[in-house]
Design a protein with these regions (language model features):
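NAD(P)+-binding Rossmann beta1-loop-alpha1 motif at the extreme N-terminus of oxidoreductases
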Residues: 23-96
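N-terminal polybasic/positive-inside topogenic patches
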Residues: 7-18, 22
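Short, basic/aromatic-enriched C-terminal tail that caps enzymatic domains
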Residues: 306-322
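Helical "substrate-binding/catalytic lid" subdomain
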Residues: 204-309
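Rossmann-fold dinucleotide-binding core
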Residues: 110, 133-213
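Rossmann-fold NAD(P) dinucleotide-binding segment
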Residues: 91-151
Length: 322
């Protein structure tokens, strides 16, 4: 019997060629994988699948709006070619025959992506919304997807996608979460069901980000100021004495790197976190301030300095942060 991974990655074949009954053939026809978006997360997942399942596990296609931008199209086509992915010109082309669809765009484009692709989803296809969005945003996307006859699943990616790639921990929720978990496990992914309601997985992700991304923003505000004041060594020594379980210098350098490389994407996520807090009837002051810091540093587009806190802080402080 074929593994779930093989089933999810099988190439479509016409019933006339295979001689299989129509119902079985339809299942085979809808067994390809598609991604909406082909950035860091999608490429990490696909490279992991390719490594685990062999050089040619089957058909994977993608639609990414960068294909419509002449300045970004070439890099997208090269990335797809490197990983054996069909780069579609339209959502309809990407989703033809796709029984499993991963939405992997930025948080601020997730609802737009669902709106654009919903009509092209196959009936009963799994739409795995892996974007870092508020429960309300995911619920709105779910209505669009399910109105088109597909199956919406809330997926939260709970760690950076590197180095784990497709083995990054995932939380899933929704009425078809168990079905989605089986598909994900079959692809060698680390998925766990956390509930049968849309929004449960994303709530965990969103509220965790208050702490994780907020800590990054606090790091920037504290240590950039300390570096400019010339007292960063004393501040770090005090932090180390207060909480020796953290290597504060190393963690601060890492936190700045995360913001420098991913700040724009993290800012979009933190706007969704702020929306989540408001939906819960709570103030969003910390989340909104975190979004501001993430965006300020991410928009600097600094070439990553050496792996040292001082070099990274200096590279940021050379720019205008006001």
């Amino acid at each position: 019997m074929a593994s779930a991974a093989e089933a999810a990655l099988a190439s479509p074949t016409s019933g006339r060629e295979s001689g299989l009954p129509d119902s079985i053939e339809e299942e085979k026809r809808m067994s390809a994988i598609a991604t909406i978006g082909f950035g860091e997360a999608a490429q990490a997942f696909v490279s992991g699948w390719r490594t685990e399942n062999g050089a040619s596990p089957g058909k994977i296609s993608t639609f990414d709006i960068k294909v419509e931008d002449p300045s970004q199209r070439g890099d997208l086509l090269q990335a797809c070619s490197d990983l054996g992915v069909d780069c579609a010109e339209t959502p309809a082309q990407a989703l033809t025959g796709a029984g499993t669809v991963f939405s992997l765009v930025t948080a601020d484009r997730a609802l737009e992506a669902a709106t654009r692709v919903a009509e092209f989803l196959g009936r009963d296809a799994l739409y795995l919304d892996c974007n870092s969005c508020s429960p309300a945003t995911k619920a709105a996307a779910a209505r669009l997807v399910e109105a088109a006859g597909a199956v919406y699943v809330d997926v939260a990616v709970m760690s950076p996608v590197h180095p784990a790639r497709h083995r990054s921990p995932l939380l899933v929720s929704g009425s078809s979460a168990e079905r989605a978990q089986d598909v994900l496990l079959g692809l060698g992914m680390q998925a766990r069901t956390v509930g049968d309601e849309i929004g449960q997985a994303s709530s965990i992700k969103m509220l965790r980000s208050v702490m994780i991304k907020g800590f990054e923003a606090l790091t920037a505000e504290c240590l950039l100021a300390a570096r400019r004041a010339g007292v960063e060594k004393a501040v770090l020594a005090s932090l180390q004495a207060s909480d020796p379980g953290i290597d504060w210098t190393m963690r601060a350098a890492y936190n700045l790197e995360r913001m420098m490389v991913h700040g724009k994407r993290r800012a979009a996520e933190m706007q969704e976190v702020a929306a989540t807090l408001r939906e819960l009837g709570l103030p969003d002051r910390m989340a909104s301030a975190t979004a501001d810091w993430q965006l300020r540093i991410g928009e600097l587009d600094i070439l990553m300095p050496e792996n040292s806190l001082e070099a990274r802080a200096d590279a940021i402080l050379e720019r205008d942060l006001t």
